[in-house]
Structure formats: structure tokens, C-alpha cells
Amino acid sequence: MLKMNNLTLEKKAQTRNLRKTLQGIVIRTSPKTIMVEVETAYKHKLYAKRFKKRKKFNTHDEKNLAEVGDFVKIAECRPISKTKHFRLVEVLQKKGEI
């Protein structure tokens, strides 16, 4: 078994790819899982009309911190299950807060 010193671990951490992070609203909760709806704005290439697309992501929420209506930040991670490939990073804003 190979032992790694701190320098090689730091180098590995620096070369690791950045994970995709998204922000969205929680639309459904269940134990350790939330469904987050992410809205992105696009511009049509030919007609230059702006439009919005919405996509839903199943997200892992280990501590059950998020509730329906919360604005959250999620990050891409290894596959946790068949449909879960994101994890909850933080709750940016609770439902009742302004």
C-alpha cells in the first residue's frame, strides 16, 4: 500500500475539476432527498428572442435542512443513486425571508 504525503494530496486537490454548481428553488422534499427546480435564460440564435428553461434535479440532502420554497445552492457530485447526481451545498434563503 502506498503512503501519500501532504504535498501529493494538495497537488491532487488542485488538479481536480471544478464541479458544476447551480441555484434553484426546492419544489419537493422527502427523506434525505429534495427536488430543486433550476431556471436558466437563453437567447435564440436566429431570432434573438429570450426564453427561460426549467429543469428539475434530484438532490441529496443528508441532514434534511431544506424545505419547500427555499432558495438553495447545489453542486454536482458522484452518482448517489439512479437519479441523484447533485448534493445540497447550502440554503441561501428560507421561504419566508426577504
From Swiss-Prot:
Gene Ontology molecular-function annotations: rRNA binding; structural constituent of ribosome
Keyword Ribosomal protein: yes
A GO term from the CC aspect: cytosolic small ribosomal subunit
Any one biological process term the GO annotation gives: translation
One of the Pfam families matching this protein, by short name: Ribosomal_S17
Membrane-spanning ranges: none
SUPFAM superfamilies, A to Z: Nucleic acid-binding proteins
Record carries keyword Ribosomal protein: yes
InterPro entries: NA-bd_OB-fold, Ribosomal_uS17, Ribosomal_uS17_bact/chlr, Ribosomal_uS17_CS
Keyword line: Ribonucleoprotein, Ribosomal protein, RNA-binding, rRNA-binding
Subunit and interaction comment: Part of the 30S ribosomal subunit.
Function: One of the primary rRNA binding proteins, it binds specifically to the 5'-end of 16S ribosomal RNA.
Similarity comment: family membership: Belongs to the universal ribosomal protein uS17 family.
Name under which the protein is recorded: Small ribosomal subunit protein uS17
Organism: Mesomycoplasma hyopneumoniae (strain 232)
